[in-house]
Amino acid sequence: MKYEVKPSNQFKKDLKLAAKRGYKIELLTDVVKKLANGETLDPKYKDHPLSGNFGFYRECHIQPDWLLIYEIDGCELILYLTRTGTHSDLF
């Protein structure tokens, strides 16, 4: 199952900041490719749903303090990339 990837404007800004910080963007790209192909992420990524008002989003760890927040729309086959950054950036 292949999902169309749609990054939010905020995600694009977050990605520029991550690159400026020297993060290895290819690590994020690999995770996004797996998600877009409908693959289950390895346990090392600690993929889980968020709670509360953010319950329809999921979060995974690219690195221990580098997160990806995303949403999958299974009906329309869309992977929304919402945010990326550190815990302090996002929460």
Describe each model-derived feature in a short phrase.
Residues 1-4, 10-16, 20-30, 60-67, ...:
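Enriched for short, Lys/Arg-rich terminal
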Residues 6, 10, 40-43:
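Generic detector of short alpha-helix boundary/capping microenvironments
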Residues 34-61:
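A short, surface-exposed loop/turn module that caps and links secondary-structure elements
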